[in-house]
């Protein structure tokens, strides 16, 4: 299946599921080296992408997803790379635009920007007590700025949260018409936000392996996304777990509308050697 220049399916293509690995950057994966090892194994085993969490305050030591993805970009040729998901209000938009542009360039146009509001459990311990409404407004305003800057625009902007005067902070991105943006979040406002962009990314399970989004839940959300104007080629990415050699629930999520399945890889699931073995066994096709 071929993609357009921004990694999205063309409207005339039949939908097909792609498979990636979701890296949780704690424990052994707080360091870039083991993640690069996973990425190389994933590419060799036929996986299509790699996404990585962007949190600051979970389970002790936390890796930097942007630095790690840069290392993965330089070590792979084919994997699509995704932030899962970056809390936009935690970043200054002009610095975020430079990071998005850098990963787009390093990867040769293989980067997708996964974005969201962030969660209180992650932000509050670092002194960020802004409510969801404020962070939503900041996210919407910042995303527009990031995309404009990644299209090499000189930006004049005076908004509720950000100001820019004749500011050009990045060269034009490799991907057209823009670096694709996927939105994370469960709420109806998050889904409406996602429908304005290029995709939605969600989790089938939580860190305890409990199901938090069933195939039926996903199907309902996909119906809502379409009603909100999600265009042809819109991606729906789901994170979950399967056993090597078995497809598990992945086909049910595909039937419900998923276009990506990301296999969760993290220290609570097993050792690095066990995760390498699972990744090397290939995707649940």
Say what each PLM segment does.
Residues 75-78, 107, 196-201, 256-260:
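Glycine-enriched alpha-helix->loop->beta-strand junction motifs that scaffold or abut catalytic
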Residues 13-31, 89-156:
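Flexible, glycine-rich active-site loops centered on histidine and acidic residues
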Residues 30-42, 99, 184-193, 243-253:
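Short, acidic/polar
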Residues 2-75, 136, 179, 279-282:
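N-terminal beta1-alpha1-beta2 module of alpha/beta enzyme domains
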Residues 19-23, 50-52, 81-83, 111-115, ...:
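Hydrophobic faces of well-ordered beta-strands that scaffold small-molecule active sites
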Residues 46, 72, 103, 146, ...:
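Conserved, mostly hydrophobic/aromatic
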Residues 8-27, 118-124, 160-178, 229-235:
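N-terminal small/glycine-rich loop or linker at the start of catalytic domains
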Residues 142-147, 213-220, 269-285:
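C-terminal helical cap(s) of enzyme catalytic domains, especially alpha/beta-barrels
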